[in-house]
Amino acid sequence: MIRNFNRSGLRILLFCVTVILLVGSLPARSQGANSDFFPLMAWDDVEDEATVQKMAECGINVIAFVPTNMLYACDKYHVKAIVFDPLVTPNWDKPFDSKPANEELPKLIKAVNNDPAVWGYHLKDEPDGNQFVELGKSAELVRKLAPGKWPYINLPPGMGGWYDTNYIDLFVKTCSPPIISYDNYAIGENVDFSYGFWANIWDVRDASLRNKVPFHTIVLTTAHFNYRIPTAADLRLQVYGSIVYGAKGIGYYKFCSKPLSVLGAPDLGNFRMGPLDEFGEKTETWENLRNLNRQIKNLSSVLLKLHSDDVYHVGDIPERNHGITTNSLVKGLEAGTQFIIGEFTHEDGSRWVMIVNKDLKNSTFCRPTFRETYHHVQYLSPSTGKIAPFPNPWYALAPGQAVLLKLE
């Protein structure tokens, strides 16, 4: 009896140890409060609790630059933190050096890694390929000392073969990121919506699928330089335009209408109408972004389980993209002229499509026709999070709005 009990106990102990090791080795994308944790990041720094609170109230659940003395506020408002330490991350215009970073990282990780808010450690923004070797050394150290935490590196925009198969592939090979994060700002004062956004995300999606690494897109929420003040439609098209390509997280640059207080970042002069203004007050953009974040949260439990199979445009076809093909699930649309359509397969094997109204000025009815006959077409409501029969032909899409359909 005692011998049998000991063997059983040993088996249980070994099982528990195995589970703990497996959980500890999960990549950053798997970590969150629950299974529907869809990262919505404020790509900004925080200096006070009030800002963290306003971010959380807007639906933000990750912050890109969190000093250690603000982790308590992230815990309080249930926001994940990418920990920032100036001894690890160089100023914005300086190359990354693993030597000082790797001297500081062990001390930093020992001090804060057990804090439940910690989701990763900030290494570098927009590095060129020459910095990947140094970044890889520090990323490896983070993985060793803080398994499951994100060695945070964000890539610059780009497009073309060099960016897709050279730059991103080199990044993945050298730094082994759990997530490919990049930024692209499509809304200019003299541009309706930059074609480069679609070419860039096509290449990122391609690299993401090829390397089996999910991607996040950082979009524009604060006007500066020659970028315009984002409207509700601008926000929707940037966010849904990323998700339709398969993005598994969204970042917002910036949240506060003022310069970063870190990285030695310069004052760009005309930051305006971000979610928080230069005095920390909530703006119309804050209200619009909160509304959009609520929609994404209601869709997140499904979005996180979808694998991107294809994406195509109706109307204007951007560079590096394609239109409807003979293999597309959607054969056409009986109303509207400008759409993006993403095809997905759910973990349970079901087929889904997302249709985005690419028109920034006009609403349109969403009346897709399908290549095959489906007995049940349902939609996941962004306002309720519930699935219901799709009310074709009455369902309309606001400018930049999307609908997620389940086909059976």
Regions found by a protein language model. Name each.
Residues I2-F15:
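Bacterial N-terminal signal peptides that target proteins for export
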Residues L26-S30:
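Sec/Tat signal peptide C-region and signal peptidase I cleavage site
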Residues L13-G24:
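Bacterial N-terminal signal peptides
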Residues R3-N4, L22, F344:
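Helix-centric, low-specificity signal for extended rod-like, repetitive segments
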Residues Q31-E408:
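Glycan-processing catalytic domains of CAZymes
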